[in-house]
C-alpha cells in the first residue's frame, strides 16, 4: 500500500515539474504589436477590435446556460423515477423545480429578463 502511494506521489511530482517547465519554456519573450492586431486580408483594420459588448447579451447567455443545465438534470430524473422511492423522487423534484423558479423570479425581479431597458 505504501509503495502505491509513493509511486503516485512520484508521478504527481514529475507531472507537476514537467507542466511548470513547459509553461516557462513556452512563454513568448515579447509581444509583437503586428501579431496581436486584428487581420483583415492584409489591410489595416477599419475599427478597433475591442468593441464594447452589451451586458444584456451576456446575461441572457448565462440564464440560457442555467436553464440548459436544468434540462440536462431533469431528463435523467424521469428515468430514475422507475428505480427509486416515489416520495423521495417527488420531494427531490419539487425542491429542484422550486429552486429554479425562485431563481427565475429573482432574475425577473432584478429586471434581467426585461429586454427593453
Swiss-Prot record:
GO molecular function, one term: NADH dehydrogenase (ubiquinone) activity
Topological category with respect to the lipid bilayer: Multi-pass membrane protein
The keyword Electron transport is annotated on this UniProt entry: yes
Keywords in alphabetical order: Electron transport, Membrane, Mitochondrion, NAD, Respiratory chain, Translocase, Transmembrane, Transmembrane helix, Transport, Ubiquinone
UniProt cross-references to Pfam families, sorted A to Z: Oxidored_q4
Reaction(s) the record says it catalyses: a ubiquinone + NADH + 5 H(+)(in) = a ubiquinol + NAD(+) + 4 H(+)(out)
EC number: 7.1.1.2
Main location: mitochondrion
Listed Gene3D superfamilies: NADH:ubiquinone/plastoquinone oxidoreductase, chain 3 (1.20.58.1610)
Spans traversing the lipid bilayer: 4-24, 60-80, 86-106
Protein family per UniProt: Belongs to the complex I subunit 3 family.
UniProt name for this protein: NADH-ubiquinone oxidoreductase chain 3
UniProt organism field: Drosophila subobscura
Gene name in the database record: mt:ND3
Amino acid at each position: 500500500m505504501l509503495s502505491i502511494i509513493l509511486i503516485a506521489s512520484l508521478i504527481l511530482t514529475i507531472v507537476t515539474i514537467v507542466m511548470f517547465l513547459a509553461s516557462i519554456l513556452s512563454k513568448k519573450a515579447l509581444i509583437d504589436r503586428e501579431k496581436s492586431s486584428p487581420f483583415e486580408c492584409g489591410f489595416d483594420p477599419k475599427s478597433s477590435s475591442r468593441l464594447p459588448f452589451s451586458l444584456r447579451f451576456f446575461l441572457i447567455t448565462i440564464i440560457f446556460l442555467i436553464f440548459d443545465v436544468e434540462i440536462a438534470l431533469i431528463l435523467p430524473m424521469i428515468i430514475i423515477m422507475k428505480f427509486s422511492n416515489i416520495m423521495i423522487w417527488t420531494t427531490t423534484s419539487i425542491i429542484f423545480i422550486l429552486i429554479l423558479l425562485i431563481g427565475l423570479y429573482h432574475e425577473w425581479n432584478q429586471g434581467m429578463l426585461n429586454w427593453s431597458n
